[in-house]
Amino acid sequence: YSGSAMQFGDNLFLFYTGNVRDENWIRHPYQVGALLGKDGKITKIDKVLIDQPADSTDHFRDPQIFNFKGQYYAIVGGQDLEKKGFVRLYKAVDNDYTNWQAVGNLDFANDRTAYMMECPNLVFIGEQPVLLYCPQGLDKSVLDYDNIYPNMYKIGASFDPEKAQMVDVSQLHNLDYGFEAYATQAFNAPDGRALAVSWLGLPDVAYPSDRFDHQGTFSLVKELTIKDGKLYQYPVAAVQELRASEETFSNRAQTSNTYELELNLEANSQSEIVLLADKEGKGISINFDLVNGQVTVDRSQAGEQYAQEFGTTRSCPIDKHATTANIFIDNSVFEIFINKGEKVFSGRVFPHADQNGILIKSGKPTGTYYELDYGRKTNWCRKTCRRQPHYRLTGHQ
């Protein structure tokens, strides 16, 4: 199962969940570790770092290590004996990554309607803690969602590690309004920025690519910021270096299906565009309704269909003022960032061979079309990829 990593000296400490099945096929989860050296060799740490707690079922996984004011901590998602989800906070004794002591269950105003907390991540934006997590089975009366499992977040005013508490916690919010974002992993970079990557693929959902033994992919790397109490997520600036050419946004009979659109929409306007469009105008429909204040994404006519039991459209409310949209298309992936990350739609799509056009169906959206070269290395990667101190490992649950 998934985990995280942190640089210690010349080694990268890998922290993850290992599962052992006994003769009765009962699962025993262990939080274990390994060291990745500069030579690329992995040496496993020959002991269990965190055992399954006595008050937890065998659903106990996904450790995230983080540094808070010079002290190393970790959180692990779990399910208690009442089949309710929780997040447990641990402290590294003397900052020794092989010696972990439980502090207690993280207090984040847990409503206790979810049966499992998967992939919890605690990241800091300034002094404010942001908890990203996947509350499986969350009661929709708490917060409505459309996907089989949600990915959500809460923001705190501050963090008290001694009490395992996020202080003055916000309401629960959907992290992404699209079809696929899950298990979002976040960390603080050396310069303090909060960065995140989402897994675009949901557990217990069959995908068209399954027949090729492939499922899921990563989102773009996103920087997290807080504005007016809202969490914004927007691709890191280095992504702009993938822009190979630019043209004025317009109808296009054919594209490479690897591009970015930077659109402007006037206040109180209504516009609809179709991406991955065929000659009949069938593809991903994106409707910007700034009269009623709503954005709707419809993939019901985009390629091979799947997961239709969870719906083929997604919507979210937006203000009716002038709006921007940055849309990234990469063959089977789309990511839509409204107002520079105020609202986000992420999803997969498996278009037919002739679905590669752009159609402005109604309205007068303006902007720029950027052809993207995903094979380019950005300056950010050249500067940081060799010595990034904090990574996240992901795996299917």
Where are each of the predicted segments found?
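Low-complexity, intrinsically disordered or signal/transmembrane-proximal segments
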Residues: Q388-Y391, H396-Q397
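Beta-rich accessory regions
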Residues: M152-C385, P389
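Beta-rich carbohydrate-recognition and catalytic domains
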Residues: Y1-D62, N67-T113, G126-Y177, L200-E246, ...
